[in-house]
Amino acid sequence: MPLINLPDFANDLIAEFVERNAERIDTPVIQPAEPFLDIAGEDLRRRIFMTESETGASLCLRPEFTIPVCLRHIETATGTPKRYAYLGEVFRQRRDGANEFYQAGIEDLGDIDLSNADARAIGDATGILARLLPGRHLAVTLGDQAVFEAVVQALGLPLGWQKRLIHAFGNMTQLEALLASLVSPQFVTGLDDDIARLVASGDEQALVAHLEREMQKTGYSTNAGRSALEIARRLKEKLILSETRLDDAAFHVLEEFLSLDVPLVNASAALSGFADAAGLKLGNALSRFNGRVAALSNAGVDLSCLDYRAAFGRPLDYYTGLVFEVTVEGSTAVLAGGGRFDRLLTFLGATDRIPAVGFSFWLDRIETERAAA
C-alpha cells in the first residue's frame, strides 16, 4: 500500500538513505506483541495499541521500527554487515499529537568496528537533519549506558541491585527513588513467620519444600505462575536487596557521576578524573567511550554541538551503550534519537551475536520545525 500524506521532504530523506548505502526495507504494520512487551521498556509498553488474532495470539500496531527491522533481518537470514533504512507509520497512544505518525531512520547491523559505527550513526542523523533544516544549529545530547553499568559494577553492589539501577538508567525519578532505598533500606515485611524464618536461614532446599507443601494445600498450579524454586529464589533476592545499604561514600560517588554534564570534547578527561578520584576502574567502558569520541572527530562531526550527560538515557530497554538525541539548539523537541543495541538481535532469535546501532527521525516534529523557518 503506498504511503499517503508524506511530508514534502520525504524524497530528500529517501535520497539521503540511498547516498548513505542504506537499503530501504518495509515491515508489516501488524506485529507480534511479545517482543515489544518484553524488551521495549515501560514508557513504550503503555502506549502500544494491542489486538489479537483469531487464534488468541497477542498482536499490536507497529509502535516503532527497530524491533520489526531486526525481526525481518533474522527471518531473511541476511548476512552482515547490513544497513537498513525505513520510512513509515508508527502507532502510539500520545497525550499530545496524533496517535499515528511517520518515522524514518537507519539501522546499522553487524559492523564490528563499534566506534566507527557509533560515529556514523550520529553523523548520519545530524547530517540528514542539516540538509532538512538548513541554517539551524543542532544540539546533540549523548549518554552511555555501558559507562553507567561499569560504575555500578565497580561499586560492588549485589547483582540484583545492579540490574535494578541499570534498568532505571535514563529515568531520574526512578533512579533517585532506588538510590533513596539503598541509603535507607526497607526491610521485607508481610511474610508468613515460617517462610520469613526459612528465607533468613538461607536453607533454599527447606524453603522450596515448605513452599511446595503450601502450594499443594492451596491448589496453586505452577502452570499458571512461578514454581516453588522460582518463588524461593525471588524471596531470597528480595531479602538481599532489602538488607543492602549503600554507604555514604559510595552514594556520593554515584551522585557525582550522575551530575556529570560536559561538552563532549571534555568528557573523556572528566570521566577519567572522576574514576581516579573515586578509585574506580571503568576498564573497557571508558576505552570504548574514548574510541567513539576519536571516531566522531575523525569522521568530521562537529563536536562543538555534542554534550555528554552521564545520567542521560532513552526510554527503551534494549539499549546497551551509546544513546543520543538531537534537537534544534534552544528547543526541547527531539527530532532524532537512537543508540546501540548489541543484545537485541540475539534476544529476538539470531543465532550469532550481531552488534547494532541505529536512530529514528520524528517526521512530524521536523515538519513543524521547517514550517517555523
Swiss-Prot record:
Keywords: Amino-acid biosynthesis, Cytoplasm, Histidine biosynthesis. It is found in: Cytoplasm. One of its GO terms (biological process) is L-histidine biosynthetic process. InterPro entries: aa-tRNA-synth_II (IPR006195), aa-tRNA-synth_II/BPL/LPL (IPR045864), HisRS-like_core (IPR041715), HisRS/HisZ (IPR004516), HisZ (IPR004517). GO terms for molecular function: histidine-tRNA ligase activity. Pathway: Amino-acid biosynthesis; L-histidine biosynthesis; L-histidine from 5-phospho-alpha-D-ribose 1-diphosphate: step 1/9. One of its GO terms (cellular component) is cytoplasm. Belongs to the class-II aminoacyl-tRNA synthetase family. HisZ subfamily. NCBIfam families: PRK12295.1-4 (NF008951). Required for the first step of histidine biosynthesis. May allow the feedback regulation of ATP phosphoribosyltransferase activity by histidine. This is ATP phosphoribosyltransferase regulatory subunit. It comes from Rhizobium johnstonii (strain DSM 114642 / LMG 32736 / 3841). The gene is hisZ.
